[in-house]
Amino acid sequence: MASHPAVAMVGVIGQPDARVGELPCAYVELIKNSKTTVNELIKHAEDNIGEKAAVPKHLELVNEMPKTPVGKIFKPELRKRAITRVYNEALEKAELSSRVQEVIDHPKKGLTAMIAKNGVNDPKQIGKILDKFIFKWE
């Protein structure tokens, strides 16, 4: 991904997947004024990454990559974004109104999705959907 001329920075993380645990996911910051599209970047990845399983299953453009104070990509923030997106998609697909309110770094459980239940969905219903994933939820 980083070899594409329009890519300024790329962060690749494992996003949750109910079937295999995690799948590759890329967040890309483009160089200023680039008009490159997600589809172009996916095609570039497919053409240049030798291992098919390593090609990102989700690619998202970001205005600015989250960084540490020394300028390195802050991957925990990217993981939180991926967990939020994947869990919300799963809840929506199951026709549940609950959504991820935030993802916290729990001292014992690690990254944990905090679910806003809105008083509508039974936690057992939510569990049937989210317990399939590797990251915890509350």
Placement of each model-derived feature along the sequence:
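Glycine/proline-rich active-site loop of Rossmann-fold NAD(P)-dependent oxidoreductases
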Residues: 22
